[in-house]
Amino acid sequence: MIRLALFGSGVSSSLSPAIYRGFAAKRGLRLEYRVYEAGPGGLAPALRMAGELHGFNVTKPLKREALSLASTLDSHARAIGAVNTMVAGEEGWEGFNTDWKGFLDSLKLYTASPPDTALVIGAGGAGRAAAYALATWGAGRVLIASRTGLTARRAAQDLAGLGAEVEPVPPGGLEDAAAASDVVVNATPLGWDGVSTPVERGFREGCIAVDMVYRPLATPFLRRAAASGCTPVDGLWMLAIQAAENIAVWLGLEASPVELRTYALEAMRGGRG
């Protein structure tokens, strides 16, 4: 039995279990993927409660916290300063970041060229991964916004030197930053409730708006962006692509993001997680 898990806040609504169970069932694999609620400082206790695992994912707010549990880090996790995937190794947990790849490849479904200016809203692990992906892809300027500005400034400092100008958005400057950006990314939890959005207005016509929130698919953020003439990219593509990357890390197998997305959509239609 291959035992996998997801740790984080609000994980009961995650579609990850449906994705991995669907993949395993199609291939006749004996695999379980369970979710464990864990808040700040709660990863290590939750891991002990879960028992022996082959690997696991972490989501908000644990992606930075998970760094301290890794015996080794891949180059992306080290540069981003966040982990979302772990696999058991000979000397302990090996940490990976597959979020950046999930984000970047989902964006590349809609554009072949890096943006001149991109705005990432949210400076946690997911936001850092998006900013890293944009900077290393060749974006000219990457703006990072956070609620207080403190984590945005820290992320901008940590991600400097990747080939792009990485700058924090000053307090009160979010709408101006959105208006100046070719790509706008929501890397916050705002939208899970189907009501909230980090940006009410200010989208530049013709921009690409990427939401890491995938439930609902048409989030308030994406609806407002579409109404302003922007191309919306739902968060389910990122989830499916990074899941394919995780399967390669954990099992050494190839997986189609299109197939994995189908399992998630089936679960959404059936009201399952």
UniProtKB/Swiss-Prot annotation:
- Cite the entry's keywords alphabetically: Amino-acid biosynthesis, Aromatic amino acid biosynthesis, NADP, Oxidoreductase
Could you give the subunit structure recorded for this chain? Homodimer.
Pfam entry (one)? Shikimate_dh_N
Catalytic reaction list: shikimate + NADP(+) = 3-dehydroshikimate + NADPH + H(+)
Record has NADP as a keyword:
yes
Name the enzyme's class. oxidoreductase
Q: Which residues bind NADP(+)?
A: 122-126, 212, 235
Active-site residues per Swiss-Prot or TrEMBL entry: 63
The record's family statement is: Belongs to the shikimate dehydrogenase family.
Q: What is the designated name of this protein? A: Shikimate dehydrogenase (NADP(+))
Gene3D superfamilies in alphabetical order: Leucine Dehydrogenase, chain A, domain 1, NAD(P)-binding Rossmann-like Domain
What Enzyme Commission number(s) apply to this enzyme?
1.1.1.25
Q: What is any one GO biological process for this UniProt entry?
A: shikimate metabolic process
What the protein does comes down to: Involved in the biosynthesis of the chorismate, which leads to the biosynthesis of aromatic amino acids. Catalyzes the reversible NADPH linked reduction of 3-dehydroshikimate (DHSA) to yield shikimate (SA).
Q: Which residues bind shikimate?
A: 14-16, 59, 84, 99, 214
**Molecular function (GO) terms listed?**
shikimate 3-dehydrogenase (NADP+) activity
Q: Specify the domain of life of the species encoding this protein.
A: Archaea
Q: In which pathway does it act?
A: Metabolic intermediate biosynthesis; chorismate biosynthesis; chorismate from D-erythrose 4-phosphate and phosphoenolpyruvate: step 4/7
